[in-house]
Amino acid sequence: GVKRVVGTDTSARALLCAQDNVNRLNMGKQITLQQSDLFPEGQADLIVCNPPWLPGRPASTLEQAVYDQDQHMLLGFLSGLSKHLAPKGQGWLILSDLAEHLGLRSRAALLAAIERAGLVVLERLDTRPIHPKAKEEADPLADARRAEVTSLWRLAVG
């Protein structure tokens, strides 16, 4: 199993919430949290990133969890991953294709960014949403949400 987890976030508020969860689960010896942009120092066998799913400019702190301005987190994760992975390590990218259904990013652009970063896709595991919004007809994004797939992209240095 995993002996040590380092979690990072740029938001002090998000880190406080995460620390509350770490404490509640009594995982303080295994999990440390750092305020950092993407990667902690050093290398790791596994690095997981769940960036905001939509390219766009957040208008509030809350929207920073939804909108990734200039795709900073997504592209930063991909471009910095090889430097931070231990030999034979993997990067796991958790990403919805909602942006593709809304015409905000193409699958080809995502695959090109992966390739530019010198990474290869080992596997992609997909799941469809089961949350209530996926079935809400009044939602203006109902068609896109019904078509949405969230994927775990297993990446490695090529």
What residue ranges belong to the model's regions?
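S-adenosylmethionine
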Residues: 8-150
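C-terminal lobe and adjacent flexible extensions of AdoMet/dcAdoMet transferase-like proteins
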Residues: 153-158
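Conserved SAM-binding loop of SAM-dependent methyltransferases across substrates and taxa
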Residues: 1-3
